[in-house]
């Protein structure tokens, strides 16, 4: 490709509305164009990168027996109503809905579990067809509330999604492991830093679930890592620091605590450390259209994890109660809710199990109790893990080694769904005994646009984008001073040789000075620059510089050999070349 033929445009100035680095650089370098809020045109330059990414995805999924198809984007409401997700998604305001001329409701697909399950239910003829692995790479839609992060949180986005159907839980797990390894190979080929973490299934399902996170400073998600084990902070099981408590119970005391409502206030008032305080928070749980309130007790130096609470109590949604909701439902104020005679159902985190002689609020304004104890003063509640993990907590899945906390961006998610969807659509087969048996399902997805944006977030430097070699739009740029006929002639010859050898060079044939071309090449992130400058004119030596700054001096006769060593062979097979 010649730059004079490439339809692209770079900009000197950053978009002031770009909230993250990837949005700024992808727009500045001519990869995306904002069509509307959260909606982007993928330019020819971007599409070259996306095609290479999709080539890698297809190669790895086809290698494990995946079959590509294309599912519809327009979904009838009754399919989503069948699984109960129509109202769940609409309640969050994320679903694009419309009504056709027959007054039937439809939506633009945010995901495809319902559609693919209905399709398989009609075509599956018997057990011998299982397992089935179907996948697509397609556009999806979500009406995001604040689509400010470019491709990280767009309203229209490109995804690969896979669906597996199996004859048993064992076969479902085998398919899960195959997809997990395939996804690992995909991200390994990108040569980026990522971790696989245990995750919460959310609205998709409640089976085994893991996320792939690219590590970067954007910090959309917080992940806990200990050795080779990782978990999203929403799902991380952690063992906090343990403290020694009194063995002898002291007499309980009611204490007036005027306007003493925070942990810090209580520490100062009673002159005690926070781990001797029982903190109680009121949580609103939503079950469809019904709301209920529960109280959660936790050690005063720690925070609750709302995702764990939602999962444990099987709620659709979970949030901290507002001041008004606390007043209306408990008759007291925030900061004065406690476990003693609590008027709503009370649960406690495991951190509180061994606490003795603790301080807690008295369910009335300006009142606390001192030296409170389980069994004597309060019946023991139901304990569960409601703890939000922190750096330094011990990881039980890694021999109680400590956690480190990192920031990352979720780029892929894999789930075991069990029979949640297949039961709704009667997807099954007859077993050896002639009994009808339901299929077991898995769902998996890679955000193509999110992955590319995450690569930019992780690898970019002060000069611009740094693409992984495997997905860069071009293998190498050929640069010379515009108007220099000798350099131009050599550049044309090298360009032709590279094309004939199957590589994807970008010949910058614009009548611009070399310095301008160098900056453009760095901005758009091409892995190598072949520079035909003074050194070439004086000695005939080719100067090559990698995007990371590594420099090579190569004689023309050795250039083909250099290409074979440094330009990845896989690029020669890419549909973008």
From Swiss-Prot:
Root EC class: ligase
Comment, domains: Consists of three domains: the N-terminal catalytic domain, the editing domain and the C-terminal anticodon-binding domain.
Subcellular location: Cytoplasm
Protein's recorded name: Proline--tRNA ligase
Gene name tied to this protein: proS
Enzyme Commission numbers on file: 6.1.1.15
UniProt keyword Glycoprotein present: no
Keyword hit for Nucleus: no
Disulfide bonds: none
One GO cellular component, as annotated: cytosol
One GO process term, biological-process aspect: prolyl-tRNA aminoacylation
Record's subunit section: Homodimer.
Upper classification of the organism: Bacteria, Pseudomonadati, Chlamydiota, Chlamydiia, Chlamydiales
Catalyses which reaction(s): tRNA(Pro) + L-proline + ATP = L-prolyl-tRNA(Pro) + AMP + diphosphate
Top-rank taxon: Bacteria
Record's function text: Catalyzes the attachment of proline to tRNA(Pro) in a two-step reaction: proline is first activated by ATP to form Pro-AMP and then transferred to the acceptor end of tRNA(Pro). As ProRS can inadvertently accommodate and process non-cognate amino acids such as alanine and cysteine, to avoid such errors it has two additional distinct editing activities against alanine. One activity is designated as 'pretransfer' editing and involves the tRNA(Pro)-independent hydrolysis of activated Ala-AMP.
InterPro entries: aa-tRNA-synt_IIb, aa-tRNA-synth_II, aa-tRNA-synth_II/BPL/LPL, Anticodon-bd, Anticodon-bd_dom_sf, Pro-tRNA-ligase_IIa, Pro-tRNA-synth_IIa_bac-type, Pro-tRNA-Synthase_IIa_type1
Family, similarity comment: Belongs to the class-II aminoacyl-tRNA synthetase family. ProS type 1 subfamily.
Keywords of the record: Aminoacyl-tRNA synthetase, ATP-binding, Cytoplasm, Ligase, Nucleotide-binding, Protein biosynthesis
Molecular function GO terms recorded: aminoacyl-tRNA deacylase activity; ATP binding; proline-tRNA ligase activity
